[in-house]
C-alpha cells in the first residue's frame, strides 16, 4: 500500500485529504480542502490562497487515478461541493471531475447527522447521484475487494461526546501487509473512536488532534484528553501516527507532539517537507505581505 498525503494544515490548508494506491486501485479519502474565512478577524493571507490552489490541483490530479472515494462527513474541508467557492476552491466542474464514474463510500446522509450536515449531504448527493458509478452508505460496514479490505466505523462524534458538529466515520484499509486507519475529525476526544481504533490494531493511524486554537474552547481539558487518548492508542497498538488537521491551527502544536509516547509526523514531515501552518500564522503573514517585520517558523520565500 502506498500512502500519498495530498492536503492538510501542515501543508497550508484545512484538509486531511489522502490517496492510497493498492496495486492498480486508487482510493481517495476525504477529497476536500478549505480555508478558514476568518481567523484573528482576518481573511486568508495570499500565501493561504496559493496553498489552497496547490491543494486543489493535487486533489483533482489524484482523483483521476482513483476508482474509490470515501467521505467521512460533509464539512467542506472533507469533500468538494458542487458550487463555486472561493475558500473551498470548488466549482461544479471540479466536483464532476472528481466524482464522475467513481464508487463512493460515504457517511450516511440521513442517520446520525446534524441539520447542517444533512442539508449539505442532500445538496451533494442531488448532483453526485447523476454522475457516480455507485454510492454505498458506509457506516459500520465491511467490504472485501480481494486484494484488500475496507472497514468503516459506526458513526462517532465529531469531537467530544454530544458535539453539535455531528458525526463522522473512520475507515480502515488493510492490504494484508499494512493496516491503516484514517480518522478525520474525531479530534481524539471521544471514547467510541478511541476504542474502535484500538480494536482494529492499525499499523498506521492518520488523525487530527483537538481544536485547541478555538477561542473560548475548553482548551486545557481538550489538550489533556486528546493527549491521554492518543497515548493510550499508541500504547495499546504501537501504531505509527500521522497527526495533523485541527491541532496544527494552534501555534503550540509542537508542544503537543513532544508530549506523545511515540514520535508522530505531520503530512508535511511525512513528505520530508517543513511544516507550513499558515492559518496559525495568518496575522504574521498579513504583516509580511505588507512589507512589515514578522517572524514565522517556516520559509516564506516560496510565495513572496
UniProtKB/Swiss-Prot annotation:
Query: According to the UniProt entry, where is the signal peptide?
Result: none
- InterPro entries named in the record: RibonucZ/Hydroxyglut_hydro, UPF0173_UPF0282_UlaG_hydrolase, UPF0282_hydrls
SUPFAM superfamilies per record: Metallo-hydrolase/oxidoreductase
Q: Determine the domain of life of the protein's source.
A: Archaea
What NCBIfam families does the record point to? Answer: PRK04286.1-6 (NF003290)
Family under the similarity heading: Belongs to the UPF0282 family.
Q: Which PANTHER family match?
A: UPF0173 METAL-DEPENDENT HYDROLASE MJ1163-RELATED (PTHR43546), UPF0282 PROTEIN MJ1629 (PTHR43546:SF4)
Output this protein's name: UPF0282 protein TSIB_1029
Amino acid at each position: 500500500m502506498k500512502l500519498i498525503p495530498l492536503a492538510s494544515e501542515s501543508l497550508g490548508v484545512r484538509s486531511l485529504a489522502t490517496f492510497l494506491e493498492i496495486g492498480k486501485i486508487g482510493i481517495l479519502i476525504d477529497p476536500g480542502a478549505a480555508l478558514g474565512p476568518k481567523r484573528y478577524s482576518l481573511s486568508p493571507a495570499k500565501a493561504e490562497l496559493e496553498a489552497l490552489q496547490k491543494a486543489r490541483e493535487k486533489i483533482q490530479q489524484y482523483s483521476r487515478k482513483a476508482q474509490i472515494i470515501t467521505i467521512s462527513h460533509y464539512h467542506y474541508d472533507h469533500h468538494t461541493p458542487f458550487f463555486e467557492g472561493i475558500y473551498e476552491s470548488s466549482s461544479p466542474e471540479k466536483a464532476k471531475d472528481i466524482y464522475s464514474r467513481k464508487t463512493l463510500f460515504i457517511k450516511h446522509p440521513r442517520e446520525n447527522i446534524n441539520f447542517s450536515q444533512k442539508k449539505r449531504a442532500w445538496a451533494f448527493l442531488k448532483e453526485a447521484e447523476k454522475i457516480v458509478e455507485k454510492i454505498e452508505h458506509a457506516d459500520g460496514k465491511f467490504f472485501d475487494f480481494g486484494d484488500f479490505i475496507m472497514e468503516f466505523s459506526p458513526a462517532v462524534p465529531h469531537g467530544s461526546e454530544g458535539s453539535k458538529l455531528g458525526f463522522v466515520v473512520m475507515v480502515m484499509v488493510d492490504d494484508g501487509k499494512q493496516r491503516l486507519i484514517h480518522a478525520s475529525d474525531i479530534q481524539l476526544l471521544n471514547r467510541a473512536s478511541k476504542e474502535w481504533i484500538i480494536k482494529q490494531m492499525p499499523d498506521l493511524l492518520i488523525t487530527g488532534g483537538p481544536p485547541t486554537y478555538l477561542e473560548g474552547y475548553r482548551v486545557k481539558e481538550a489538550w489533556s484528553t486528546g493527549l491521554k487518548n492518543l497515548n493510550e492508542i499508541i500504547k495499546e497498538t504501537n501504531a505509527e501516527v500521522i497527526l495533523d488537521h485541527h491541532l496544527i491551527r494552534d501555534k503550540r502544536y509542537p508542544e503537543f507532539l513532544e508530549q506523545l509516547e511515540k514520535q508522530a509526523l505531520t503530512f508535511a514531515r511525512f513528505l520530508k517537507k517543513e511544516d507550513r501552518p499558515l492559518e496559525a500564522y495568518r496575522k504574521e503573514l498579513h504583516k509580511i505581505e505588507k512589507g512589515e517585520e514578522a517572524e514565522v517558523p517556516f520559509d516564506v520565500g516560496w510565495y513572496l
